[in-house]
A protein has these predicted regions:
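N-terminal/edge-of-domain interface segments
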Residues: 1, 38-41
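Noncatalytic regulatory segments and standalone regulatory/sensor domains
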Residues: 3-19, 24, 29, 50-53, ...
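Active-site-adjacent structural segments surrounding the nucleophilic cysteine of cysteine proteases
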Residues: 126-128, 134-220, 395, 407
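Low-complexity basic/metal-binding stretches
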Residues: 331-332, 337-347, 353-398, 403-409, ...
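Conserved active-site-adjacent core of cysteine acyl-enzyme catalytic domains
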Residues: 38, 204, 209-343
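Short, exposed beta-strand/loop patches in secreted or surface proteins that constitute
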Residues: 13, 17-25, 30, 249-252, ...
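Beta-sandwich interaction modules
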Residues: 10, 14-16, 41-56, 64-147
Length: 445
């Protein structure tokens, strides 16, 4: 699928157009070739050369499964200055491998890589791209499988389109920084948004699990968007980075798919703006002021109940950087969870047991018998059990938290009110209520 400056490669027909070296296609995925029932130790796949509009920034994404003792490495090169640059690696990747982003420059000095973004240093920018993925294994019975490759560029002269106005709102779980593990820092905003995007489609994953799965060991942060897309791919969700305009965002919402968007704000005392990842969950129109607005989930809010916010469309277009992460509903059968920590990965268990007398009316009380010494804040996971099927709130306004004195808000909240009863489709069905006397707890897989 090609949308101007965004390129997404997936499926047998698309992958078959590239060059396969010790690599085979199996169920629409790139896997290592086999001989006598054993996988080869190394293989490589190279895409065709793609022409793109002149661009200054490039973001590459991949979705792959990599069992134990297997690994994936994605590389790219750019056509700039009437020649192809050298290959630039995004580092070796696997769910249980200590991922490290790379800051490097090509030998010819025409492009350089900072984390998840390739920048073209030539005056005319780049006009072509080519991707390559290397697969390797130390176990001849296991192979990595690459299901999606994508490349997104920011054009030098970006002719942005607005598309048709849209009045639609989608359900998206609310997570805020203050209610989750503070040791990840402010950059945990991206894991919060990614967890919300996956849990909207019925996944049951904590933001902390996403943070561990996409943590960049080079910077000890969770701000790498390429690792975020790869973590979502491990759970079976097609996910990729993109550079989107308003028309692209409206198309995603029209297709019942919330989007992770990056907006910038300025903080007093700092010269450079600060980027924040938010969840875009809809568009609307206010007849009272005759203005369009967008519906966002702001993870920097005071509490989970105040994450939902509204921003004027004109303000959003001024703050929106164009960077986005698209995630689609999984159409593949459930796979063993590669992200969840457990004793086999060196993680201690959280032992939960019921405490106190059985009080069905008052709920169940759980006590933590053991906590990891470095992570003493219990994750707070909020599913949508009380949300009607249409995604609307049950007939009552949200409780507004007290505003902290002197704290600057990430965006101007024009208003807060319950979602309308005629909200759009796409919310997950309500979960079945627990029967009295049962206790639910998360166990490691």
């Amino acid at each position: 699928m090609e949308q101007r400056n965004n390129l997404v490669l997936q499926g047998t027909e698309t992958f078959s157009r590239g060059a396969l070296d010790n690599v085979a296609l199996e169920s629409g995925a790139l896997v290592l070739d086999s001989s006598a029932g054993r996988y080869l130790p190394y293989g490589s796949y190279t895409t065709p050369e793609f022409a793109m509009p002149a661009f200054c920034n490039l973001n590459v994404s991949w979705n792959a499964s990599a069992p134990h003792n297997t690994m994936v490495e994605v590389r790219c090169r750019v056509y700039a200055g009437n020649t192809w640059t050298g290959w630039m690696s995004f580092g070796k990747w696997a769910p249980d491998y200590p991922r490290c982003s790379i800051n490097a420059q090509s030998e010819d000095g025409m492009i350089f890589l900072l984390g998840d973004t390739v920048t073209v240093a030539t005056p005319g920018g780049g006009t072509g791209i080519q991707l390559q993925v290397n697969l390797s294994t130390n176990d001849d019975k296991s192979t990595p499988a690459v299901r999606l490759l994508s490349a997104a560029v920011r054009p030098l002269t970006w002719e942005k389109h607005e598309g048709r106005p849209l009045n639609r709102r989608l359900y998206l779980p609310e997570y805020c920084l203050s209610a989750h593990d503070p040791s990840f820092g402010r950059e945990m905003d991206l894991p919060l948004v990614m967890a919300a995007l996956m849990n909207r489609w019925g996944e049951d994953i904590l933001p902390e699990e996403v943070a561990y799965a996409m943590e960049d060991n080079a910077t000890r942060s969770t701000g790498n968007a390429a690792f975020a897309a790869a973590a979502a791919g491990c759970c079976g969700f097609p996910c990729w980075q993109a550079w989107m305009d308003l028309q692209d965002l409206r198309t995603q919402i029209h297709d019942d798919c919330p989007v992770a968007v990056r907006v910038e704000r300025r903080i007093r005392g700092q010269r450079d703006p600060v980027g924040i990842w938010m969840g875009l969950r809809g568009f609307g129109h206010d007849d009272a002021v005759m203005a369009d607005y967008v519906l966002l989930n702001d993870p920097t809010a005071d509490s989970d109940g105040s994450v939902n916010c509204t921003m004027a469309l004109s303000d959003f277009l001024r703050y929106f950087t164009g960077r986005a992460i698209a995630l689609r509903c999984s159409r593949r059968p459930a796979q063993p969870r590669p992200l969840r920590p457990g004793p086999q990965r060196g993680w201690p268990l959280l032992l939960l047991r019921a405490a106190g007398p059985a009080r069905p009316a008052a709920g169940r009380f759980l006590r933590l018998d053991r906590l990891h010494p470095a992570r003493r804040h219990r994750p707070c996971h909020h599913g949508p059990p009380d949300v009607p099927p249409d995604g609307a709130h049950p007939g009552r306004g949200p409780v507004l938290p007290a505003r902290t004195a002197g704290r600057r808000r990430a965006v101007q909240r024009l208003r807060r009110r319950p979602d309308r009863p005629d909200a759009g489709r796409g919310s997950p069905p309500a979960r079945a209520a627990q029967t009295p006397g049962s206790t639910a707890c998360r166990t490691s897989e």
